[in-house]
C-alpha cells in the first residue's frame, strides 16, 4: 500500500493494534482524507470532491498550482444499502464526474447482517446505468487455478449460486465447513 500501512497492521486487520475496518484519521497511520463508516458518507464525499475540484479548476478559482487529484474510495458491499450513495451517483452522472474510482469489496459480509442475495446481480448494472465503466475482479489466482482443474466449472457455478446466508456461515466455519459443504453438494 505504497508504504502507508505496515504488514503487521494488515495481518492484524480489525484486531487490537491492527488496521481499522473503516478508514479513520484518528486510528490509522495512513493518509486518509475522509473517514467513512456503514453510512456511506465518505464514499459520497469522494464523488462530490471530484465535482468541486473540476468546478474550481474550470472557474479558475485556485492558483492552478495543484495537480488534479484522484478520488478513490474503498466501499464495502453493505454500504451500497445507503441511499446517499445513489443520490451521489445520480449527481455524478448529471455533472460528468471524473477522476473517481470506487473499489467495491463484495464480500457478502456486513456488521449489521447478511447482504441481500439479489444485490450482487445488480451492482454493475446500477453503476453502468449512470455512465461508470465497471471492471469486475471476482476471483483470485487460487480460485482461477481451481477452476482450471477437472470439475472446476462446477466449483465456479457452486460459488456463484451459493446464497449469502450460507456463504457467510461457511466463512465463519472456516476450511472444514467449506470442505463439508462442497463434498456434500
Locate predicted features.
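Cofactor-binding active-site loop characterized by glycine-rich and histidine/acidic residues
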Residues: 1-95
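Short glycine-/polar-rich loops that comprise or flank the Walker A/P-loop
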Residues: 69, 96-100, 131
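Short internal beta-strands
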Residues: 99-107
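Long, well-ordered, tryptophan-enriched scaffold segments
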Residues: 106-185
Amino acid at each position: 500500500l505504497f508504504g502507508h500501512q505496515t504488514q503487521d497492521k494488515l495481518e492484524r486487520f480489525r484486531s487490537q493494534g491492527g488496521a481499522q475496518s473503516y478508514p479513520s484519521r484518528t486510528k490509522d497511520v495512513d493518509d486518509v482524507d475522509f473517514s467513512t463508516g456503514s453510512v456511506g458518507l465518505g464514499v459520497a464525499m469522494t464523488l462530490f470532491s471530484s465535482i468541486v475540484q473540476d468546478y474550481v479548476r474550470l472557474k479558475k478559482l485556485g492558483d492552478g498550482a495543484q495537480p488534479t487529484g484522484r478520488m478513490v474510495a474503498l466501499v464495502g458491499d453493505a454500504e451500497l444499502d445507503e441511499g446517499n450513495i445513489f443520490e451521489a451517483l445520480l449527481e455524478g452522472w448529471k455533472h460528468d464526474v471524473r477522476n473517481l474510482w470506487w473499489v467495491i469489496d463484495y464480500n457478502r459480509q456486513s456488521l449489521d447482517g447478511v447482504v441481500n442475495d439479489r444485490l450482487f446481480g445488480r451492482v454493475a448494472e446500477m453503476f453502468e446505468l449512470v455512465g461508470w465503466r465497471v471492471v469486475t475482479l471476482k476471483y483470485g489466482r487460487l480460485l482461477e487455478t481451481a477452476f482450471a482443474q477437472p470439475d472446476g466449472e462446477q466449483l465456479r457455478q457452486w460459488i456463484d449460486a451459493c446464497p449469502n446466508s450460507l456463504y457467510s456461515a461457511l466463512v465463519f466455519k472456516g476450511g472444514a465447513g467449506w470442505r463439508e459443504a462442497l463434498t456434500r453438494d
